[in-house]
């Protein structure tokens, strides 16, 4: 078959192929079982294969690259406008193929297996942190029903209250409640141990990667943030500028301009929420500690704080840090504070 471009609709078991030649004539439209996919593409001459950036897309992108094909991943929201008629696999594959023909189409970079492994650690850690927060809130709520209130916020205060209640003699709570609190305490300690173990694994990965080590010199960037940014961004040279990288993270203002009048709103919040959250949390810590410092960055932050709310300043610093991280990753240079 004389194929120049293929749209491949991914699934668990049945894949849909839509292929066109260099004249945009349809020359292939068929279904493939999962076991047939590699053999089908192995028999084809090298061509452009486009897929939606969905579950297992990076795996199949790596597999098809090994077979000599050029692979492009497209975000689903950019494919949807090209779907004709009702949604089914054949229309989806055709839409993917059509979207890949657009000269201005934006593509998702293919991640390596190592990048996905690091991201998996971050995803699991994030889920465990959410579970720990929910459990702490549950413990505080249950104890509050018996008039036992923590005087401070945070995990340490919750655990201290829990241990105080369990150690008090005579027991201030009914016997069934005491047994329940022991189970909740064990569950909370298990979550703490699992989170700590994952953080040690992430830190070990950071220590073994000189590229990530360079990111730690930026104020507001710790091992968790540096590891997550490096794993998600991959080759930062895919972004032409630092502003494009910040926009990819959703840290630039949303724009609604017309007739030459520029109107900027809140940040767009596009892209990876987890990465954006880490950068803003790190920036917030820097903003909180800048009051008594005299370096250029602290003076800049102090000036902003006189005009804008602290959270706005934190987002501005997160934007600046994102641009710095892009420069360090794309140019493979060390951070030199201004």
Curated annotation (Swiss-Prot):
Keyword DNA-binding: yes
Gene Ontology annotations of biological process type: DNA transposition
MF (Gene Ontology): DNA binding; transposase activity
InterPro entries reported for this sequence: Transp_IS110-like_N, Transpos_IS110, Transposase_20
UniProt KW keywords: DNA recombination, DNA-binding, Transposable element, Transposition
Stored NCBIfam families: transpos_IS110 (NF033542)
Protein family: Belongs to the transposase 20 family.
PANTHER family (UniProt xref): PUTATIVE TRANSPOSASE FOR IS117-RELATED, TRANSPOSASE FOR INSERTION SEQUENCE ELEMENT IS1111A
Function: Required for the transposition of an insertion element.
UniProt-recorded name of the protein: Probable family 20 transposase
Provenance organism: Pseudomonas aeruginosa (strain ATCC 15692 / DSM 22644 / CIP 104116 / JCM 14847 / LMG 12228 / 1C / PRS 101 / PAO1)
């Amino acid at each position: 078959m004389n194929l120049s471009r293929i749209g491949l609709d991914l699934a668990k078991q049945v894949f849909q192929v839509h292929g066109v030649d260099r004249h945009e004539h349809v020359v292939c439209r068929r279904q493939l079982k999962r076991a047939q996919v590699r053999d089908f593409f192995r028999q084809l001459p090298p061509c452009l294969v486009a897929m939606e950036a969905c579950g297992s897309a990076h795996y199949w992108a790596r597999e098809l690259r090994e077979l000599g094909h050029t692979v492009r991943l497209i975000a689903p929201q950019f494919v949807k406008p090209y779907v004709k008629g009702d949604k089914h696999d054949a229309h989806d594959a055709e839409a993917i193929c059509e979207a890949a023909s657009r000269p201005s189409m934006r593509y998702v970079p293919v991640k390596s297996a190592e990048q996905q492994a690091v991201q998996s650690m971050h995803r699991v850690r994030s889920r465990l942190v959410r579970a720990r927060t929910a459990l702490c809130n549950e413990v505080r709520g249950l104890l509050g029903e018996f008039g036992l209130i923590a005087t401070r916020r945070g995990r340490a205060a919750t655990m201290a209250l829990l241990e105080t209640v369990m150690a008090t003699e005579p027991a201030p709570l009914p016997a069934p409640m005491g047994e329940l609190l022991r189970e909740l305490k064990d569950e909370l300690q298990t979550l703490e141990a699992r989170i700590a173990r994952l953080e040690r694994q992430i830190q070990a990965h950071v220590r073994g990667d000189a590229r990530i080590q360079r990111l730690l010199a930026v104020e507001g960037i710790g091992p968790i943030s540096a590891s997550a940014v490096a794993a998600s961004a991959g080759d930062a040279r895919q972004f032409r500028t630092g502003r494009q990288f910040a926009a990819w993270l959703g840290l630039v203002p949303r724009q609604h301009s017309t007739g030459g009048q520029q109107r900027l709103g809140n940040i767009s919040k596009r892209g990876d929420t987890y990465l954006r959250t880490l950068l803003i949390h790190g920036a917030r810590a820097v903003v909180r500690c800048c009051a008594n410092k005299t370096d250029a960055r602290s003076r800049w932050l102090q000036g902003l704080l006189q005009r804008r709310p602290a959270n706005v300043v934190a987002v501005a610093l997160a934007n600046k840090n994102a641009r710095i991280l892009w420069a360090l990753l794309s140019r493979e240079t060390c951070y030199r504070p201004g």
